[in-house]
Amino acid sequence: MTATALQNSLYPSFGVINSFSIYEYKDTEYEEYALSVLRLANDNLSQSIAHFWKLPFTEKEINYHLLSKLEPLLKILQKITLEEEVSQEIQREALLFIDNALTYKDLLTDYFEERELLLSNSKRMITPILIKNLDDEIQTR
């Protein structure tokens, strides 16, 4: 899932959800539209989670920053799902989306933390070798 695909999937649905009171779009095309967008976003997130290790580094980085910026919207979406006027289908899809988004963000967070730790350890391990090689090089000259 690219950041653009996620943005294109999510921002229109949040626009729909935030533009109208829930009761104004219930049983209209907007409810169906919001539901279809949530399903598409869930499918995209599920694919990203399932194929996490196949995603390029830059895509992971972009998605991490995008999901970080979406966190306030996830809180809004969670509040909206608690309203009685929201259909059970939308509640279910919205909660699944929130769960998938948080799971994916946790995966990304762990990935970047482990990557940073690995890079840090690699630098510490290679430094003595580089110093020894430099010393050997200096002594041979």
Q: What are the language-model segments listed below?
A:
Residues L6-I138:
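Long, low-complexity or tandemly repetitive, helically biased scaffold regions used
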